Amino acid sequence: AYERAEEIGFPILLRPSFVLGGRGMFIVYDMDEMKKIVREVFDVAPGTPVLLDKFLEDAYELDVDCISDGERTVIGGMLQHVEFAGVHSGDAAMVMPPHTLSDEMLETVRQASYALAKELEVVGLMNVQYAIKDDELYIIEVNPRASRTIPFVSKAIGVPLAKLASRIMAGEKLKDLGFTKEIIPPYWAVKESVFPFNRFPGAPIMLSPEMRSTGEVMGLDKNIGVAFAKSQMAAKPALPDSGDVFISVKDADKERAVQIAKGLSALGFGVLATVGTGKLFKKNGIDVKNVCRLSEGRPNVIDLIKNNKVSLIINTPQGTVPRQNENEIRTEAMKHNICIMTTISAASAAVDGLSLIHISEPTRLTSI
């Protein structure tokens, strides 16, 4: 396995040969980390095959739900993940229709989905998970069955896909059922996952290849930022409209974190950051207050959380396993019902939503 990992090149996705819900999956960034995980996890069951895949870092991920009668295939919905690839599809926030992909790429996705359904002779539902990196399309997996996104897609387009699929499997055709072309909803539909972290104090609060969510909510609006903000209000502590924001991100996220901090500052939020991130913010003209790391002294961010001095936390993990300090911060935030973003993509979408809510009319209802 170590030799194959060197051949494939890091980062890699390391997992048991058969898993459900991403159980036992790890994104591994170097050989030392891989050896540690293999010793701690896979040596428990010697002889169990281990699968290694090249991990496409910073790739966009897309879920496509289709229905086919064996002759005609219709796409029920295409959902773009808010987070980059690496977060389990059951945990990822998703936007329907896709919001950043080109029309050309979406057409490529459609044709690939039609071809897969035809070659696999699908009669019923099919889900395909794609990754897109550098304008190249990759197939992650194909499941000739109903996926967990079917209820969401059905509600978004107003078509009971599971009901249609059962009738198709009994011999009826899409033409007879009146569903012959893809429906693009006239609004944005955002799926956000609901997590049970407040029920399990001390559990790692981090999005990863292993699924942790126990439910989901839907945000609808004519504006994508507002739709995302609505989903956050329903799924977790609501996005704040004022206060101080603590930002601590890994090196790969710092460029985008600058734009996020600028956006929050323009909305009247105070910006808090550790020394390294704070220097970068100051260099870019952002007014920032430095906060001690947990190992550097006090007051640190946990002190501020306990004293209700923080209203939003943006904290992205470094590598596969969060450092102990990072986990303590996220755990304390959950205890105090503070909204926390653990991926830079989600943080960016949240800022967009806050910006629009600040300048728009009161939150409106969207009919489906």
What are these regions, as identified by a protein language model?
Residues 8-11, 21-23, 27-241:
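ATP-dependent carboxylate activation and anion-phosphoryl transfer catalytic cores
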Residues 1, 64, 113, 329, ...:
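Aromatic/hydrophobic pocket-lining residues that form π-stacking "cages" and hydrophobic walls in ligand
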Residues 125, 133, 146-151, 155-164, ...:
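Acidic, glycine-enriched active-site microenvironments
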Residues 1-25, 286-293, 345-353:
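A conserved helix-loop-beta module that forms one wall/lid of the active-site cleft
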Residues 357-368:
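Single conserved hydrophobic/aromatic residue that forms the stacking wall/gate
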